[in-house]
Amino acid sequence: MNQYDLNLILNPNISAEQVQTEKDYIENAVRNAGAEISNLDDLGNRRLAYQVGKDREGYYLMYTIKASGNPETAIASSLRLRDNVRRVLVVKDRPEWKTKKA
């Protein structure tokens, strides 16, 4: 199984209930693509480097998923249809990209 990073930026103005609804939908989309979630980092609202739509902030969710095959298109295409999702990025995790801390 390959490991992937799934990074999402959500609408910064959504409530805690809506965030939970989005998390549930994301979990279902990942499972439907034949993958499993191994880690979730909920970073909350952060300032964006540039404006996305009318927003200068975004609600960040970073998942680590394990999947066989190529789940990128199946997961990303279903998540991009959501109204509260601003950006989706699925990247294959490679150990050589990790930096070593001194």
From Swiss-Prot:
InterPro entries on file = Ribosomal_bS6, Ribosomal_bS6_sf, Ribosomal_S6_plastid/chlpt, Transl_elong_EF1B/ribsomal_bS6
Which CDD domains does UniProt cross-reference here?
A: bS6 (cd00473)
Q: Which Pfam families match?
A: Ribosomal_S6 (PF01250)
Query: What keywords tag this UniProt record?
Result: Ribonucleoprotein, Ribosomal protein, RNA-binding, rRNA-binding
GO annotation terms (biological process): translation
An example GO CC term for this entry is:
cytoplasm
Molecular function terms from GO: small ribosomal subunit rRNA binding; structural constituent of ribosome
Q: List the disulfide bonds.
A: none
Q: What role does this protein play?
A: Binds together with bS18 to 16S ribosomal RNA.
Instruction: Name the HAMAP family on file.
Output: Ribosomal_bS6
Of which family is this protein a member? Belongs to the bacterial ribosomal protein bS6 family.
Protein name in the entry: Small ribosomal subunit protein bS6
